[in-house]
Amino acid sequence: MLIAQRPTLTEDVVDEYRSRFVIEPLEPGFGYTLGNSLRRTLLSSIPGAAVTSLRIDGVLHEFTSVPGVKEDVTEIVLNVKNLVVSSEHDEPVVMYLRKQGPGAVTAADIAPPAGVEVHNPDLHIATLNAKGKLELELTVERGRGYVSAAQNKTGEQEIGRIPVDSIYSPVLKVTYKVEATRVEQRTDFDRLVVDVETKHAISPRDAVASAGKTLTELFGLARELNVEAEGIDMGPSPTDAALAADLALEIEALDLTVRSYNCLKREGIHSVGELVSRSEADLLDIRNFGQKSIDEVKAKLVGMGLHLKDSPPGFDPSAVVNDFEDDDTSFAEDEQL
């Protein structure tokens, strides 16, 4: 059976709605395979919400104008297409906008129902004069990809309802590149860098996670043909392997003082893994193992990125006074009593 080193995925956050994801090391050629699949899935298959149609009070079709409104209906429709919304509803929902002039009409004037959110409230929709008045009824639906206005038009659509091109995808832009990376003596492994920029309706992390779930479901269909078929198995990640190695270390490697070391050995704690499975309360129950010994152990563990059971990470070893040797002699005397 072929075993490949398990790749790692890291995220470099550029801003709230843009991140770079690095996956490495990948077997030669897999960078383009995975990068192209991720890009296409991110751009076309992430579910989202969009306006599918609108109705303007007093307007029968889009090739007209509204009294007191600077923009004609076609311009208003184009502006509405740029709305960024999210919806928790599987069924179509309706939002309303009612504004009396004079002044600008923005997405902040929309009153969305519960479960629907408008993410770009500063979006300009129209401009009203002193006598202007605008009333909109916006239908929001969930979907994927792009759906044209013609496709959103239903056969029994009411007079005055204007279908809108719907861009459901919450992902704005995806680019990727494949670089060479080194694994031991080989330099032909792939390093995949995927740059993802999203609308305000979703974070890049959630978008990539959604794309990964979709691809896993699809590729799972091929595996169902023969679940025992041989492939390339992924070995443990470098992080898991390093952690396992640290946990397997004997406590001698911690270079503890004589008091702390002897107390732990007497209690039957021989490895770092056995040590981190104990809480502070467990260790304090050990004879002659006091708070000073607890602080020493915590200081040693934090240097390895570990901590005792039920203890929060982040212990500051610099706060511990390095005087652990003071009681070693008295402890030795206690041992002989």
UniProtKB/Swiss-Prot annotation:
It is an enzyme of class 2 (transferase). Residues 243-337 are annotated as: Alpha C-terminal domain (alpha-CTD). Keywords: DNA-directed RNA polymerase, Nucleotidyltransferase, Transcription, Transferase. It catalyses: RNA(n) + a ribonucleoside 5'-triphosphate = RNA(n+1) + diphosphate. GO terms for biological process: DNA-templated transcription. It comes from the Bacteria. This is DNA-directed RNA polymerase subunit alpha. It comes from Kineococcus radiotolerans (strain ATCC BAA-149 / DSM 14245 / SRS30216).
